[in-house]
């Protein structure tokens, strides 16, 4: 059985026991959060597709840790004008494990 969930504006295909990196969740490490926006559930060949989400379907995610991704460098300049700006960014993320899928 697997499900397609939406969190942080992105969609993920998950099974029980999967570990994935999602946009940072407002929960502490070790806490369990509920992904109630389940778009589809596939169970024993039976497909349940929601409009927009499947009713009474829940996916429980355990937050393992929070972190920040690799640094990306944004560099912009204007030619011949001595205008240069260098800026770095590290996107925060949460590493979660799928504990249980209810459908």
UniProtKB/Swiss-Prot annotation:
Pfam families: Ribosomal_L21p
Listed InterPro entries: bL21-like, bL21-like_sf, Ribosomal_bL21, Ribosomal_bL21_CS
GO cellular component, as recorded: cytoplasm; ribonucleoprotein complex; ribosome
Presence of the UniProt keyword Ribonucleoprotein in the record: yes
Molecular function GO labels: rRNA binding; structural constituent of ribosome
GO biological process: translation
Annotated Basic residues bias: 83-92
Annotated region (Disordered), positions in chain: 83-103
Keyword Membrane: no
Swiss-Prot/TrEMBL keywords: Ribonucleoprotein, Ribosomal protein, RNA-binding, rRNA-binding
NCBIfam families on file: L21 (TIGR00061)
Family matches, as HAMAP family: Ribosomal_bL21 (MF_01363)
Function field: This protein binds to 23S rRNA in the presence of protein L20.
Family: Belongs to the bacterial ribosomal protein bL21 family.
Subunit-structure text: Part of the 50S ribosomal subunit. Contacts protein L20.
Name this protein carries in UniProt: Large ribosomal subunit protein bL21
Organism in which the protein naturally occurs: Pelotomaculum thermopropionicum (strain DSM 13744 / JCM 10971 / SI)
Underlying gene: rplU
